[in-house]
Design a protein with these regions (language model features):
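Active-site-proximal substrate-binding groove within the catalytic cores of carbohydrate-active enzymes
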Residues: 41
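Amphipathic, alpha-helical segments enriched in basic
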Residues: 5, 9, 14, 44, ...
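Carbohydrate-active enzyme catalytic cores, enriched for enzymes
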Residues: 1-38, 90-91, 209
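CBM-like, beta-strand-rich accessory domains located in the C-terminal region of large
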Residues: 46-231
Length: 231
């Protein structure tokens, strides 16, 4: 809309057989004042592997390294049939939302009947990621992944603060439902190091506990005050 102040998000529908495809149906990016908070890592230096049968062994191509769930221990799969369904977009003066069923982006072993991912942005206030799911079985834990270039702090009370160029942000969630942990993603590819001006990214993993055949979760990201995590 010609403005760069406040929150901005973009989300992807489509399918997993698009030009220069990543397995990222339903993923999003989030910026604040035109600076990154939640990211798509992008793609590294092109190699023979990038355009060959081993393409999806590259971590940047995998749904696990996008802002997406791992369902029953199963990531999304490449192919035109692995696609978004039932998409809805709404925008008002105060709110923008995008909703999509991403269940069909996952293979059969995910045992997912429906997985409704909803993004809601309240302009200059917060960004909400809501997941509502129905599974046919619970074989392995399901995990909500967030990728960020921010520094991530999780205190002893499991409060989460992201700190980066865009400022400080609090991630709010149901601590009885989601158990957070972080992975450091080391960057060794020169192109990625240059793109992010750093040698590491962070993946936040929210494991759904206990496992549930059906349920709903919510992640809220909002600007944080410059106080300690325990305040």
């Amino acid at each position: 809309e010609g403005k760069s102040d406040g929150f901005f998000f973009a989300a992807k529908g489509g399918n997993n057989q698009e030009s220069h495809n990543h397995n990222d149906v339903g993923s999003c990016i989030l910026y604040y004042n035109a600076l990154p908070v939640l990211i798509d890592a992008g793609v590294g230096t092109y190699t023979r592997q990038t355009f060959g049968p081993e393409r999806y062994t590259i971590w940047t191509m995998q749904s696990d390294y996008h802002n997406l769930p791992l369902i029953n221990g199963t990531p999304q799969k490449n192919g035109r049939e692995f696609a978004a369904h039932s998409q809805q977009y709404k925008a008002t003066a105060k709110t923008v939302s995008y909703q999509v069923d991403i269940a069909r982006a996952y293979p059969q072993e995910a045992n997912v009947k429906s997985w409704i991912r909803n993004y809601t942005l309240h302009r200059k206030k917060d960004f909400i990621i809501t997941d509502k799911w129905k599974l046919s079985a619970c074989n392995e834990p399901s995990v909500l992944n967030l990728m960020t270039c921010c520094e991530v702090e999780i205190d002893r009370n499991k409060n989460i603060i992201l700190t980066g160029e865009a400022g400080r942000f609090r991630v709010e969630y149901d601590k009885k439902l989601l158990s957070p942990a972080t992975d450091t993603v080391e960057l060794t590819d020169p192109k990625l190091i240059h793109s992010w001006n750093r040698k590491k990214l962070t993946r936040i993993r929210f494991t759904i506990v206990p496992q549930q055949i059906s349920g709903e979760s919510k992640l809220v990201i909002r600007k944080a005050q410059y106080k300690t995590l325990n305040d």
